[in-house]
Amino acid sequence: MKKIAVLTSGGDSPGMNAAVRAVVRTAIYNEIEVYGVYHGYQGLLNDDIHKLELGSVGDTIQRGGTFLYSARCPEFKEQEVRKVAIENLRKRGIEGLVVIGGDGSYRGAQRISEECKEIQTIGIPGTIDNDINGTDFTIGFDTALNTIIGLVDKIRDTASSHARTFIIEAMGRDCGDLALWAGLSVGAETIVVPEVKTDIKEIADKIEQGIKRGKKHSIVLVAEGCMTAQDCQKELSQYINVDNRVSVLGHVQRGGSPTGADRVLASRLGGYAVDLLMQGETAKGVGIKNNKIVATSFDEIFDGKDHKFDYSLYELANKLSI
């Protein structure tokens, strides 16, 4: 292994820079040249590929986002388009590609490894949604979780001041982990997630029971993959008449300096990705399972169901929110 490349793809997440840094420095430590692909798979097509040095990743571990930039590239699903990308790697003698991103990013990496045996590919899970099989946690999840906690804590201050119910929408796509973990952490009265059937009347009854016991305000935390906060508000109004407001947290959840947990995870996964390439491994995603760094084939990741919603945590949150 003489030359490798690294790119970030899909939605950005805090800790991506730390992962790139780990890839670059582990490779250079092992006398491997490293190239950065700017703007994700689009950069592969546009030949936006540049050599990275030790200094290229200096002062990046604490930065959110990705200095390599990211972009959606739906045309990468077409084989003729991928041929251009593969040729741009081959002409530089690049033998390994590390892809940091989510499920779609992994699928692009798998296609490259299938269509060009000369290029090994390894995926690193970078997304705030925590929705990738083969790992307990994705890079960016912990930072986004802490961002949500900070925001909801502030919203609770104003909710209590005005005796209001706030319906707050968190990101997560089709995975309820962010809403679940944040909801437990902030003491939300109700958590609405895609993994659990939503009964709006039950939510209304719970809020009403709280009011009867003297509660002055409530927090309803909604995962975007289940319903919008506005829809939740509209349906709730059919069963209960309380002063309420909607707050959609939005893209602020993707930003910010990564937490220590995300920096450590990104560093461990980035270093291990290079180790795997040096061992001749390909078409695998790295992850953390039971605090151990592991590698799982892309096929297993796409077919697997090992990243399960924690129903016991959901039940605990329900018990504690009475």
Curated annotation (Swiss-Prot):
It comes from the Bacteria. One of its GO terms (cellular component) is 6-phosphofructokinase complex. Gene3D superfamilies: 3.40.50.450, Phosphofructokinase domain. Substrate binds at residues 127-129, 164, 171-173, 224, 245, 251-254. PROSITE patterns: PHOSPHOFRUCTOKINASE (PS00433). Pathway: Carbohydrate degradation; glycolysis; D-glyceraldehyde 3-phosphate and glycerone phosphate from D-glucose: step 3/4. Changing residue 164 to A: Complete loss of fructose 6-phosphate binding. GO terms for molecular function: 6-phosphofructokinase activity; ATP binding; fructose-6-phosphate binding; metal ion binding. It catalyses: beta-D-fructose 6-phosphate + ATP = beta-D-fructose 1,6-bisphosphate + ADP + H(+). Homotetramer. Homodimer, inactive form. Component of a possible RNA degradosome complex composed of cshA, eno, pfkA, pnp, rnjA, rnjB, rnpA and rny. Interacts specifically with RNA helicase CshA. HAMAP family: Phosphofructokinase_I_B1. Belongs to the phosphofructokinase type A (PFKA) family. ATP-dependent PFK group I subfamily. Prokaryotic clade 'B1' sub-subfamily. This is ATP-dependent 6-phosphofructokinase. The gene is pfkA.
